[in-house]
Curated annotation (Swiss-Prot):
Species the sequence originates in: Pongo abelii
Record family assignment: Belongs to the TRAFAC class OBG-HflX-like GTPase superfamily. OBG GTPase family.
Gene: MTG2
Topology in the lipid bilayer: Peripheral membrane protein
Record localization: Mitochondrion; Mitochondrion inner membrane
Protein name: Mitochondrial ribosome-associated GTPase 2
Subunit structure and binding partners: Associates with the mitochondrial ribosome large subunit; the association occurs in a GTP-dependent manner.
Region (Not localized in the mitochondria): 30-406
TM spans (from-to): none
Role summary: Plays a role in the regulation of the mitochondrial ribosome assembly and of translational activity. Displays GTPase activity. Involved in the ribosome maturation process.
GO-annotated cellular components: mitochondrial inner membrane; mitochondrial matrix; mitochondrial ribosome
Keywords on record: GTP-binding, Magnesium, Membrane, Metal-binding, Mitochondrion, Mitochondrion inner membrane, Nucleotide-binding, Ribosome biogenesis, Translation regulation
Source taxon at top rank: Eukaryota
Binding site for Mg(2+): S238, T258
Binding site for GTP: 231-238, 256-260, 278-281, 345-348, 371-373
Length: 406
């Protein structure tokens, strides 16, 4: 037997070894893997723009625009089939010394429905398969046992999903928990007990279950967000979204860098979150589906208020606002009249300074001048964004509706 003092000495040696190993391991860690108390000084920043981003330790690398096109899907063609009904049973009661017990075949169970449900945690149609088959009902049994009905199959889709059949809109799942029965399950078959009659005391007839309903549905996603950034290609919308949130859309010096909508979350005190959508750049004639205009414009329909992003370095920048409002109005009447703010981006460029006064004179309203690249005047945008959100919330509550919570 090992003496107690020897055991405690060995235990002390083991703990000391573990302590030396932990210190040496932390010393060899890269800066990106440091513990929270060793994080970079940027995490301690108290500026308004930095507080709008939720501070997190570096993790996985952001998805590139090419990979994002695989993960973000805004259209699906789905074949949905309801569950088949179970077959009825044809049998007779069997009991000792009772030769003619009568029919006791039970009915089959009903097939399960296929239901689409709007889920707040789902942001894309990428998880939706191209075919769904509902659960079938069980067959009936003897002793008047009915078959169990098939379970309901739920398909989770993001909020803002339009369900179309043959070019006709059959459902609009715009709220959390909205459901739509995509395919009905088949009815269960009848057992021979169902056909018992005065003129037929021993029926042997039973019916099979009915097949489930089959439908081809087209799912279209319209991005649901509080604010939607609208502008021409290369206006700096993606750079602006990166500056005020943790979203990481692709940024490059050529137009049409963004091909799919991005949604960034701006954080405020009191755990308030405002969702801002970066809509791909639209061009003149977008309402006629030029440059995939219809595919881009439909993501603006669900935005509660708009942010018109103008490239201040371009000649006559006020024409950009007029053209954007015209395209929105031609696409959907009243869309351009929603609450909005005008953002003049790229003020850090020399040619932008000369256009600023002309822009204000032509528009005759407040213009938020900033630079997404340098972060100049981002605080004014964040404060004005909060004002637009408060006005939207007050209007929704005044009409007895709950505002959108992200």
């Amino acid at each position: 037997m090992t003496p107690a003092r020897h055991f405690s000495a060995r235990l002390r040696t083991v703990f000391e070894g573990v302590g030396h190993w932990a210190l040496s391991t932390q010393a060899g860690l890269k800066p990106s893997r440091l513990l929270p108390q060793q994080a970079s000084p940027r995490l301690l920043s108290v500026s308004c723009a930095d507080l709008a981003k939720r501070q997190e330790l570096p993790g996985k690398k952001p998805l590139s625009e090419k990979k994002l096109k695989r993960y973000f899907v805004d259209y699906r063609r789905v074949l949905v089939c309801g569950g088949n009904g179970g077959a009825g049973a044809s049998c007779f009661h069997s009991e000792p010394r009772k030769e003619f017990g009568g029919p006791d075949g039970g009915d089959g169970g009903n097939g399960g429905h296929v239901i689409l449900r709007a889920d707040q945690q789902v942001k894309s149609l990428s998880s939706v398969l191209s075919r769904y088959q509902g659960f079938s009902g069980e067959d009936g049994g003897s002793k008047n046992c009915f078959g169990r009905s098939g379970a309901v199959l739920y398909i989770r889709v993001p909020m803002g999903t339009l369900v179309k059949e043959g070019g006709r809109v059959v459902a609009d799942l715009s709220r959390v928990g909205d459901e739509y029965i995509a395919a009905l399950g088949g009815a269960g078959g009848k057992g021979n007990r169902f056909f018992l009659a005065n003129n037929n005391r021993a029926p042997v007839t039973c019916t099979p279950g009915q097949p489930g309903q089959q439908r081809v549905l087209h799912l279209e996603l319209k991005t649901v967000a509080h604010a939607g950034m609208v502008g021409f290609p290369n206006a700096g919308k993606s750079s602006l979204l990166r500056a005020i949130s943790n979203a990481r859309p692709a940024v490059a010096s050529y137009p049409f860098t963004t091909l799919k909508p991005h949604v960034g979350i701006v954080h405020y005190e009191g755990h308030l979150q405002i969702a801002v959508a970066d809509i791909p750049g639209i061009i003149r004639g977008a309402h006629q589906n030029r440059g995939l205009g219809s595919a881009f414009l439909r993501h603006i329909e669900r935005c509660r208020f708009l942010l018109f992003v103008v490239d201040l370095s371009q000649p006559e920048p006020w024409t950009q606002v007029d053209d954007l409002k015209y395209e929105l109005e031609m696409y959907e009447k009243g869309l351009s009249e929603r609450p909005h703010a005008i953002i003049a981006n790229k003020i850090d460029l020399p040619e932008a300074q000369a256009n600023l006064s002309q822009l204000r004179d032509h528009l005759g309203q407040e213009v938020i001048v900033l630079s997404a690249l340098t972060g100049e005047n981002l605080e004014q945008l964040l404060l004005h964004l909060k004002v637009l959100y408060d006005a939207y919330t007050e209007a929704e509550l005044g009409q007895g509706r709950q505002p959108l919570r992200w």
